[in-house]
């Protein structure tokens, strides 16, 4: 599925397409294990489609919630050499 088509889908349609692609992927993997098909190219395309759909879905979730909070504080941490100097000065 093309990226433009995926971006134009609603959230509900994205979920439906994700479920369809997952089911097709399951069936294709099962057929490959049973030796009924050699659809390696189709398997690769389905995996990429699932990744595209989930990426677009995740982008929408993050846009609603805003940016992720920063993990570190803005104040610089003391280095070991500064800590040692302050201990020596205290004595």
Swiss-Prot record:
Pfam families: Ribosomal_L29 (PF00831). GO terms for cellular component: ribonucleoprotein complex; ribosome. Residues 79-91 have a biased composition (Basic residues). One of its GO terms (molecular function) is structural constituent of ribosome. Keywords: Ribonucleoprotein, Ribosomal protein. Residues 67-91 are annotated as: Disordered. Gene3D superfamilies: 1.10.287.310. InterPro entries: Ribosomal_uL29, Ribosomal_uL29_sf. The keyword Membrane does not apply. One of its GO terms (biological process) is translation. NCBIfam families: L29. Belongs to the universal ribosomal protein uL29 family. This is Large ribosomal subunit protein uL29. It comes from Acidobacterium capsulatum (strain ATCC 51196 / DSM 11244 / BCRC 80197 / JCM 7670 / NBRC 15755 / NCIMB 13165 / 161).
């Amino acid at each position: 599925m093309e990226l433009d088509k995926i971006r134009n889908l609603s959230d509900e349609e994205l979920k439906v397409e994700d479920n369809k692609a997952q089911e097709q992927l399951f069936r294709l993997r099962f057929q490959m294990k049973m030796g009924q098909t050699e659809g390696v190219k189709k398997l690769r395309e389905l995996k990429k489609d699932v990744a595209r759909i989930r990426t677009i879905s995740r982008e929408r979730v993050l846009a609603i919630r805003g940016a992720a909070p920063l993990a570190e504080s803005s104040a610089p941490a003391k280095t070991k050499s500064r800590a040692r100097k302050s201990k020596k000065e205290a004595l």
